[in-house]
């Protein structure tokens, strides 16, 4: 059962694209449209990902930032995440106007994270590649990987855990430490088929 209708997913992707283009070209932060569906004012976690069109998977990512927790209305969070992904991802320089025609926009709407309980060595059995995203936390360190990432890279559950630890700036086996907290979540993902093209629900398996 989907929480996000296909037409809402398309609305969010178009909104993210507009937010990015207005900010990159004009330095303007757009307001939520008047025709925003009421359901999209509910608070939800969301990430916006920018990919280089037709680039190999290892080279495709151009920016990805979002909010794991439902702290903003989804429509507002999408605008914020889109702009941040375009100009504030510390891994990349800000997106330039001439790049906009070569980037696809992807929006992932997240469920609230839930802790994975039990002995650490059982954690791989409690997650599923193609369904779950992960958050790893220990002390001041935290890292998140979206559900599509292990699918795109061909990881199994243990490698997914190790890579999320690495993303947090921790040793790759930190998921075996009882002091490390691991959370899982799911996401409904919508993407442009090509820059400014039709929007589709992204299958993970």
Swiss-Prot record:
The lineage of its organism: Archaea, Methanobacteriati, Methanobacteriota, Thermococci, Thermococcales. Residues 7-201 form the AMMECR1 domain. PANTHER family: AMME SYNDROME CANDIDATE GENE 1 PROTEIN, AMMECR1 HOMOLOG. This is Protein TGAM_1450. Pfam families: AMMECR1. InterPro entries: AMMECR1, AMMECR1_dom_sf, AMMECR1_domain, AMMECR1_N, AmmeMemoSam_A, Uncharacterised_MJ0810.
């Amino acid at each position: 059962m989907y929480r996000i209708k296909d037409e809402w997913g398309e609305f969010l992707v178009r909104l993210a694209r507009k937010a990015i283009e207005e900010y990159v070209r004009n330095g303007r932060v757009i307001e939520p449209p008047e025709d925003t569906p009421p359901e999209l004012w509910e608070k939800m976690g969301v990430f916006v990902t920018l990919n280089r069109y037709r680039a190999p998977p290892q080279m495709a990512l151009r920016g990805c930032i979002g909010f794991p927790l439902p702290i903003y209305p989804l429509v507002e969070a999408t605008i914020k995440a889109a702009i941040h992904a375009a100009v504030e991802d510390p891994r990349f320089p800000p997106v330039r106007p001439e790049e906009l025609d070569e980037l696809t926009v992807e929006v992932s709407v997240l469920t609230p994270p839930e802790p994975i309980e039990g002995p650490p060595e059982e954690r791989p059995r409690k997650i599923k590649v193609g369904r779950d995203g992960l958050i790893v936390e220990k002390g001041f360190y935290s890292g998140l990987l979206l559900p599509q990432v292990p699918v795109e890279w061909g990881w199994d559950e243990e490698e997914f855990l190790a890579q999320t630890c690495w993303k947090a700036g921790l040793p790759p086996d930190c998921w075996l430490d009882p002091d490390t907290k691991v959370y899982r979540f799911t996401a409904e993902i919508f993407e442009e088929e090509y820059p400014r093209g039709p929007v589709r629900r992204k299958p993970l398996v």
